[in-house]
Amino acid sequence: MLRSLVGSEMCIRDSMKTGYPIVYTSADSVFQIAASEEKVGLPRLYEMCEIARKILVGEHGVGRVIARPFVRKGDGFERTSNRRDYALEPSEHNVLVHLADAGVRVCGVGKISDIFHGSGICASVHTTGNTDGMQKTLDYMQTEPAGLIFTNLVDFDMKYGHRRDTLGYKNALEEFDAWLPKLYAQMTDEDILIVDADHGCDPTFKGTDHTREYIPILMYGKGLKQGTDLGTRPTFADIGKTVEEYLLGSCVDDEKAIGKSFLQDIM
């Protein structure tokens, strides 16, 4: 239920009565605005987030401003798939920009374009959840002969992780696992699949926040070595540099880059 994430039942009832939004923050540099789709409407909610984004820069900068629309459901309330993220533009060049500058197409599925403020993204499509995101990934594989398809399956985080819905999380994992053969069937000999995460959100842990644990790096491709143990990497950025080296043939010379490619370990 929404109230478990953004405050008390009274807070939401007051918002429904007055039309005022609910504003809250979290530890991972996020400023969030929640409002009723029926009472406030999506255009007004998005407008408020755009205003907040312009304010929350520099000394008061936060990584993302997030629009959190919700609707009534039974006796309570539920978030909808009309969330929007308004991110700071990346301060330095990133792998997506390097790829785009080299003419490599980068397609975002889900909130990827929002997270990177559109930086380096050539095409993007919104999704309504995991099932839709998986299908749109397959759709891009049909229409994009080469490049990077970058997909975010948001239900693991928003719908099940934060809500500590262990059964829902388990069912979502099984759905993803059952879907993978469809993805494998569309992969060419040159394609590489990387399954990872940007943080933990353990549905069995106390509270509702992200959880701290090492993320997985699961990779599959017909041209990869089998059973390679990559060990514990020093940074999440290693994945990005590996993608960059594979698609460009070499890593871009960038003295500020913190990632290190492990492509030679898997090819």
Give, region by region, the residue ranges found by the protein language model.
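Extended, H/D-rich, highly charged conserved domains that either
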Residues: 35-36, 43-110
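Beta-strand elements within well-structured catalytic alpha/beta cores of enzymes
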Residues: 99, 147-155, 180, 191-200, ...
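Active-site regions of oxyanion-processing enzymes, predominantly non-cytosolic
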Residues: 19-22, 63-65, 137-157
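Substrate-binding rim/cap in mid-to-C-terminal beta-strand-loop elements of soluble/periplasmic
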Residues: 209-249
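Polar, surface-exposed loop/tail segments
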Residues: 249-267
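Single conserved hydrophobic/aromatic residue that forms the stacking wall/gate
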Residues: 1-7, 11-12
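A long, amphipathic alpha-helix that forms part
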Residues: 134-141, 156-191, 204
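A glycine-rich, aromatic-flanked flexible loop/lid motif
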Residues: 106-118, 144-159
